[in-house]
Swiss-Prot record:
Its main location: membrane. GO terms for biological process: CDP-diacylglycerol biosynthetic process. GO terms for molecular function: phosphatidate cytidylyltransferase activity. Pfam families: CTP_transf_1. The chain crosses the membrane at residues 30-50, 73-93, 100-120, 127-147, 167-187, 205-225, 235-255, 280-300. It is a multi-pass membrane protein. It is found in: Cell membrane. The gene is cdsA. GO terms for cellular component: plasma membrane. This is Phosphatidate cytidylyltransferase. Its EC number is 2.7.7.41. It catalyses: a 1,2-diacyl-sn-glycero-3-phosphate + CTP + H(+) = a CDP-1,2-diacyl-sn-glycerol + diphosphate. Pathway: Phospholipid metabolism; CDP-diacylglycerol biosynthesis; CDP-diacylglycerol from sn-glycerol 3-phosphate: step 3/3. Keywords: Cell membrane, Lipid biosynthesis, Lipid metabolism, Membrane, Nucleotidyltransferase, Phospholipid biosynthesis, Phospholipid metabolism, Transferase, Transmembrane, Transmembrane helix.
């Protein structure tokens, strides 16, 4: 009987692994096609819609955690606010050169109005105005700001001589961050025994963390070797990509840990129940912390060309 249970456990683990590989491979293929066509008008609007939708779903999932914890009543309201914030952000970042100057302020104006409106929208809420406004604001910013910064990384080189440089940087950011996730998952599953934070994220192991760091370093080294010749002038110190990739892998790990803390506080295993994925936050969590690091790096090192 014991052997039978072990067999079922292993079979279930392999089935889950197979589903993860299939789902993430399909998502990755779609993402690559979308990224590398993101400078064309039609596909750029598709990307804008998809990123705004992802942000809205992520915000809804975070708000649902708050609902489970403290009966937060505005999950859908916050998700709509996140969608509008990111849709306006996309328009101002991608098409700002052809829009009136005041358009850059619209996303932030909407955010302020949305938070104030949330206070008056639920007058009899059991959690109070301070908590209500705080959860509404944070639920939008937690997901919305990193996605907005990702759009900056992708499109801020569009008016330079090398508009595809933004796509290169976006690819580097995703590859190193999610590569660390993948290396950490597989090696942690195969060889990991010692847990890093068993009370927060039981599946995170020391072996997985080290493997993730090595994976991010390896991927950044590959990018370093394959820098296109036409981009060379933008990389006065190209070797800095290697420690940057490591930093993105490490911050991505802590982004994952932060989301796990939120889930444990709400007594949830996954942020949602998408097959083989968990939820939008479970997919984006590592990028939510690594994206601001990549943005700051570009803002400092590419200040002449990068329109942050």
């Amino acid at each position: 009987m014991l052997n039978s249970n072990k067999f079922k456990s292993k079979t279930g683990a392999y089935g889950d692994l197979f589903q993860r590989v299939v789902v993430h491979s399909l998502v990755l293929t779609f993402l690559v096609l979308l990224l590398y066509s993101s400078l064309f008008p039609l596909t750029s609007f598709a990307l804008g819609f998809i990123t705004a939708t992802c942000g809205a779903v992520g915000t809804y999932e975070y708000s649902s955690m708050a609902k489970a914890k403290m009966h937060y009543p505005l999950s859908t309201f916050s998700a709509i606010g996140s969608f509008l914030f990111l849709a306006l952000s996309f328009l101002s970042i991608r098409w700002g050169h052809s829009l009136p100057g005041f358009f850059d302020a619209l996303p932030w104006t909407l955010l302020i109005v949305w938070v104030v409106w949330s206070i008056f929208r639920v007058r009899k809420s059991t959690i109070g105005a301070l908590q209500l406004s705080g959860v509404t604001l944070f639920s939008i910013l937690y997901v919305g700001i990193p996605i907005r910064l990702f759009l900056h990384v992708l499109y801020s080189f569009i008016h330079t001589q090398e508009p595809y440089l933004g796509i290169w940087w976006a690819s580097f950011l995703i590859a190193t961050t999610k590569g660390a996730d993948i290396f950490g998952y597989f090696f942690g599953k195969a060889f990991g025994n010692k847990k890093i934070a068993p009370q927060i994220s039981p599946n995170k192991t020391v072996v997985g963390f080290v493997a993730g760091c090595l994976g991010a370093t390896l991927i950044s080294f590959i990018f370093f070797l394959q820098i296109p010749t036409r981009f060379a002038s933008y990389f006065p110190m190209p070797a800095i990509l290697i420690p940057l990739g490591l930093a993105l892998g490490i911050t991505g790990f802590f982004g994952d840990i932060i989301e796990s803390i939120f889930k444990r506080d709400a007594h949830l295993k996954n942020s949602n129940k998408l097959k083989a994925v968990g939820g939008m936050l479970d997919t984006l969590d590592s990028l939510l912390l690594s994206t601001p690091i990549a943005y700051l790096f570009l803002l400092i090192t590419q200040s002449k060309e990068f329109i942050g």
